[in-house]
Amino acid sequence: MASPSEQYIFGEFSDDEFKQFFVTARCTVELPPYNEHFFPCGPQSSGDFQDGEECPRIEFGIEEVIDHNTTLPNNTDYSISSNLNPQAPEFILTCSSSPKDSNNVLHENNFDAIDCQFSESSIPDGSGNADSDGTSGTGQRERKKKKKRPPGYYSYLEGVGDVPSETLLNGHANSAGLNSISTDDPDLAEDIPISTTSPRTCTSPDNFVDLNNEALSDDASMHNVLDNTRTAGQPEECSVTSSEQSCIPSDNGRESPVRTAVVQPFAGTDTTENLGVTNGQTLESPEEDTASNGVVLHPEVISLSEEAKAEEISTAQAVIHLPGSASANAPAKSWASLFHNSKPSSTPQVAYVETKNTPPVTSLQVTEKQVEIKEGPVPVSEDPVAIKIAELLEEVKLVHKPVSLQPRGLINKGNWCYINATLQALVACPPMYHLMKSIPVYTKAQKPCTSTPMIDSFVRLMNEFTNMPILPKAKQAPGEKVVRDIRPGAPFEPAYIYRLLTVFKSSLSEKGRQEDAEEYLGFILNGLHEEMLALKKLLLPQNDKIHINNGPDPVFATEEVNKEEQEGSDEEWEQVGPRNKSSVTRQADFVQTPITDIFGGHMRSVVYQQSSKESATLQPFFTLQLDIQSEKIRTVQDALESLVARESVQGYTTKTKQEVEICRRVTLEELPPVLVLHLKRFVFEKTGGCQKLIKNIEYPVDLEISKDLLSPGVKSKIFKGQRTYRLFAVVYHHGNSATGGHYTTDVFQIGLNGWLRIDDQTVKVINQYQVVKQTVERTAYLLYYRRVDLL
């Protein structure tokens, strides 16, 4: 069957060459004249052109037909791309098929869906072609034996039919060539986002990315051909002219971010959000795919026509290596050379792309669903929900009831073991868990900026854990410890907790610094305390001010006495102690918050001086610092007794510059609901710097605070149940070095009525004797106790 319109090419072809390179009504090839005569060689369906008569001259480019009176079929099912060597499978043109209709039956019978050439599968028996019985412009030709092709040579022709199939790009579904970016130009390399996502091909027009078109080609039918055949996430089809490459975007009225002809990340990704990454900056953009230099750019159509070159624009040249293509610097090839060499050149083709430098947009486009998030904490006056949280914290009542949570490990992708170990202990603390669960979780739309990043992060952390029902104890014998298996939840990475170190510019985030679990615990508790103080200030009248205490800091005896002698102390009163001895007690301004109600206690430091009244200072604490350096200290009780022992201060002088002897004694004035004991294993020595004390310190599961440790004024007020504690978490330090090591945590699980050992994302059940048993490699560092009367 003849083609719809007659086209002519020049030169003699063999049967196989004619079949392979016969050009359909989509395009024609002009070869040098053969003996200066024109010979029609296309199949004729009419007698419009006679033998030897000149046919209309049609210029043919590598990828396009430059003809204002184009004869291309107005069909959007085909696309043309560069084909320097049609015999090589890697140069097969991109094309897709569509269901047939009555208007396209003629085309479907005569044209193959790949490269739009005649193929054996597309020509029915008895149909006329250039080598059959039908007449052609060059006369009757003798049939020749068909050349043998290697196995699988025509495999790329399989699957072409009515059902849309996966589109081939240069003979392959993988568009690796688009990701092969030359880094010869460092400026370009910085501005080009490189996607590592594996591309997917798709023939559905709904998945294509449409670009604004400002300068379309003169040939409208070319746009119809090129519009629907691009791979999803692939740049526009490119037309190469004079060793330069220009891209023709699809003509669609919808706006979308710019796609340059140099490189384009593929649309198919494994993440839930599309992120445009440029120059190291990541922008969350659910609806916008790409951002350039932090702003969304609108497309500029790139053209290498003479009119576009005449415009006053700044251009940037980019080099793209196209594997499997001929080198751009190679000498020009004649059309006849196509028949002599079917092997692709090993030298990659270098295509130069000219792009316009679009002026930067001053404002970033933000969708309706997106809300601008300010970096870092803001003042409480700018926080839209700060007053709500303040009112909630003012009315909150601490809940000490144990809660059974499904354990979850924490993924450690860095040196975060000291953080993970501390977080697991805090999650196992019932009043801490209930406090954070009482604060609602706000969305970004409800809370676009925050004055409480630490509170927000720990509210989010506690909501990562779900309740697990407490197992019945009916079958449990008295005194028997039942250990059951447990199925932990999926581990997760609390990256929002790690970021707090940089938000508050903590010294723990400094490189090369030893991470310390006790120091991190103080960082967390002090940070939460300060944020709650700032919220509490919102509820007070404007003339009332709160002095924000940065948390309990250690006070040395000499500094303390000097402060006591200064006039205008914060607060002081005179007390009459035993034997009618009076003492002056001073206390710094201290405002309670829910954090201090859980972890906060008070110590009384009394200074004794000859011929002077006793002076006492109350100072708060979150953790009790226990010195274990002495050889006499083998248990926690020994360390507590050493804490309250009287010590002498040498070298103290009065205002008269007379050296006097003074003594100091520390006692416990107020015991917190949650008592954290810090075993000070890291000490500084004059010869060896910081060293770790590797010694076993025995600690009981049930700890009783002796009355001798209490201040004289509270001994009779605190009952035994209020000074008895039970262990619920232990943080261990692994290793013998003070400048390295690892941290793990054992926590008591009320649902199991037993203990769990958590090492980052590993969770396993252990027995109680394994908790109190220490080894040389693993030593207890932080002990978490709860008051028995609150259990």
UniProtKB/Swiss-Prot annotation:
Its main location: cytoplasm. GO terms for biological process: autophagy; cellular response to interleukin-1; DNA damage response; DNA damage response, signal transduction by p53 class mediator; DNA repair; negative regulation of canonical NF-kappaB signal transduction; negative regulation of stress granule assembly; protein deubiquitination. It comes from the Eukaryota. The keyword Metal-binding does not apply. PANTHER family: UBIQUITIN CARBOXYL-TERMINAL HYDROLASE, UBIQUITIN CARBOXYL-TERMINAL HYDROLASE 10. It holds the Pfam family UCH. Its EC number is 3.4.19.12. It comes from Xenopus laevis. PROSITE patterns: USP_1, USP_2, USP_3. Residues 118-156, 270-291, 560-580 are annotated as: Disordered. It is an enzyme of class 3 (hydrolase). Residues 118-139, 270-284 have a biased composition (Polar residues). Keywords: Autophagy, Cytoplasm, DNA damage, DNA repair, Hydrolase, Nucleus, Protease, Thiol protease, Ubl conjugation pathway. This is Ubiquitin carboxyl-terminal hydrolase 10-A. InterPro entries: Papain-like_cys_pep_sf (IPR038765), Peptidase_C19 (IPR050164), Peptidase_C19_UCH (IPR001394), USP_CS (IPR018200), USP_dom (IPR028889). The gene is usp10-a. Belongs to the peptidase C19 family. USP10 subfamily. Hydrolase that can remove conjugated ubiquitin from target proteins such as p53/tp53, rps2/us5, rps3/us3, rps10/eS10, becn1, snx3 and cftr. Acts as an essential regulator of p53/tp53 stability: in unstressed cells, specifically deubiquitinates p53/tp53 in the cytoplasm, leading to counteracts MDM2 action and stabilize p53/tp53. Following DNA damage, translocates to the nucleus and deubiquitinates p53/tp53, leading to regulate the p53/TP53-dependent DNA damage response. Component of a regulatory loop that controls autophagy and p53/tp53 levels. GO terms for molecular function: cysteine-type deubiquitinase activity; cysteine-type endopeptidase activity; p53 binding; transmembrane transporter binding. The active site is at 417 (nucleophile), 742 (proton acceptor). GO terms for cellular component: cytoplasm; cytosol; early endosome; nucleus.
